[in-house]
Curated annotation (Swiss-Prot):
Superkingdom of source: Eukaryota
Gene that produces this protein: Pf4
SUPFAM superfamilies recorded: Interleukin 8-like chemokines
Protein name: Platelet factor 4
Subcellular location: Secreted
Role description: Chemokine released during platelet aggregation that plays a role in different biological processes including hematopoiesis, cell proliferation, differentiation, and activation. Acts via different functional receptors including CCR1, CXCR3A or CXCR3B. Upon interaction with CXCR3A receptor, induces activated T-lymphocytes migration mediated via downstream Ras/extracellular signal-regulated kinase (ERK) signaling. Neutralizes the anticoagulant effect of heparin by binding more strongly to heparin than to the chondroitin-4-sulfate chains of the carrier molecule.
Gene Ontology molecular functions: chemokine activity; CXCR chemokine receptor binding; CXCR3 chemokine receptor binding; heparin binding; receptor ligand activity
Family in the record: Belongs to the intercrine alpha (chemokine CxC) family.
Length: 105
């Protein structure tokens, strides 16, 4: 039996394919927007940001890193209930308001 014949018999269900297609953008967005681990060097923590809206119920904490010698722009990092961290795009109007309020306090 050839390998092609074996793989023809292993067809995933349409529901499974649809689920994979629906989850793929979310996984890519979260992994691409993850803050880099800090190793003490003077650089921005957030290399890539996410502009997608995240429901406030999913966020456990927000951290604002002010602009300074390490990075020219303020950074907004959300920690989600599942423990993952996402760098949020500070140009999104909602996130601009959050940064302004946090920097004023």
């Amino acid at each position: 039996m050839s390998a092609a014949a074996v793989f023809r018999g292993l067809r995933p269900s349409p529901e499974l394919l649809l689920l994979g297609l629906l989850l793929l953008p979310a996984v890519v967005a979260v992994t691409r927007a993850s803050p880099e681990e800090s190793d003490g060097d003077l650089s921005c923590v957030c290399v890539k940001t996410s502009s997608s809206r995240i429901h406030l119920k999913r966020i456990t904490s927000l951290e604002v890193i002010k602009a300074g010698p390490h990075c020219a722009v303020p950074q907004l990092i959300a920690t989600l209930k599942n423990g993952s961290k996402i760098c949020l795009d500070r140009q999104v109007p909602l996130y601009k308001k959050i940064i302004k309020k946090l920097l004023e306090s």
